[in-house]
Amino acid sequence: MKLYQKFPETQVLTTQGVIDFYKDIFGKGKWLFLFAHPADFTPVCTTEFVEFSKAYNDFANLGVQLVGLSVDSVYSHIEWLKDIQEKYGIKVPFPVIADPDKKFARLLDIVDEASGQTIRGVFLVSPDGVIRFIAYYPLEAGRKISELLRITKAMIVNYKAKVVLPANWEPGQDVIVPPPNVFDEATMRMKMPKAKSWYLLFKDYNELPQDQKV
């Protein structure tokens, strides 16, 4: 799958039952944050599940549903989640997709055929079913959850307010109004207080309507 493509219309088996993405997530106005891990009972993936569990409410408060994925069986997932709860005292609150036949993972093009495992991938999908963010991480290094939360907030603001976000943007900081494609509008922009150029116009985040903020 690629950026801006439609997410597959399918159902998947998870540790919390069968999920229909378009009915159970997008149909309820939620975003999907899908993250794949290489395998259950592996060290880096275990630390990621602990940290994603800690951040679960941060995502949920944004209207984002976390969903995990690997090509392990649902029974393997259950045993692993039990082990995490016993070792760390954390109950994993999000569903984890079981995909032992690799059918769903191949739809997303995230199977490492050499190892047979899913790669450490991330897909952020808006409520209209469009993929807004994709990232891949190496086997050897875990994901930084705070950065994934930041990019999630950025894409939600982009989706709602139709603005774009500058480098290192954090909620509360200025946003950017997309550049115009009409000459007269480009000329008028230079008179605006936060204009750096006709193509770079900042806007105060606090001027956005409340329902467009995060």
UniProtKB/Swiss-Prot annotation:
Anything else known: The active site is a conserved redox-active cysteine residue, the peroxidatic cysteine (C(P)), which makes the nucleophilic attack on the peroxide substrate. The peroxide oxidizes the C(P)-SH to cysteine sulfenic acid (C(P)-SOH), which then reacts with another cysteine residue, the resolving cysteine (C(R)), to form a disulfide bridge. The disulfide is subsequently reduced by an appropriate electron donor to complete the catalytic cycle. In this 1-Cys peroxiredoxin, no C(R) is present and C(P) instead forms a disulfide with a cysteine from another protein or with a small thiol molecule.
Enzyme class, spelled out: oxidoreductase
Thioredoxin domain location: 1-157
Protein's name in the database: Peroxiredoxin 2
InterPro entries cross-referenced by the UniProt entry: AhpC/TSA (IPR000866), Peroxiredoxin (IPR050217), Peroxiredoxin_AhpC-typ (IPR024706), Peroxiredoxin_C (IPR019479), Peroxiredoxin_TDXH (IPR022915), Thioredoxin-like_sf (IPR036249), Thioredoxin_domain (IPR013766)
Subcellular localization, as worded in the UniProt entry: Cytoplasm
Pfam families named among the record's database cross-references: 1-cysPrx_C (PF10417), AhpC-TSA (PF00578)
Keywords associated with the record: Antioxidant, Cytoplasm, Oxidoreductase, Peroxidase, Redox-active center
Presence of keyword Oxidoreductase: yes
Function: Thiol-specific peroxidase that catalyzes the reduction of hydrogen peroxide and organic hydroperoxides to water and alcohols, respectively. Plays a role in cell protection against oxidative stress by detoxifying peroxides.
Positions of disulphide bridges: none
PROSITE patterns: THIOREDOXIN_2
NCBIfam families: PRK13189.1, PRK13190.1
Subunit field text: Homodecamer. Pentamer of dimers that assemble into a ring structure.
Entry GO CC: cytosol
Binding locations of substrate: 120
This enzyme's EC code(s): 1.11.1.24
Family membership noted in the UniProt record: Belongs to the peroxiredoxin family. Prx6 subfamily.
Location of the active site: 45
Substrates-to-products reaction catalysed: a hydroperoxide + [thioredoxin]-dithiol = an alcohol + [thioredoxin]-disulfide + H2O
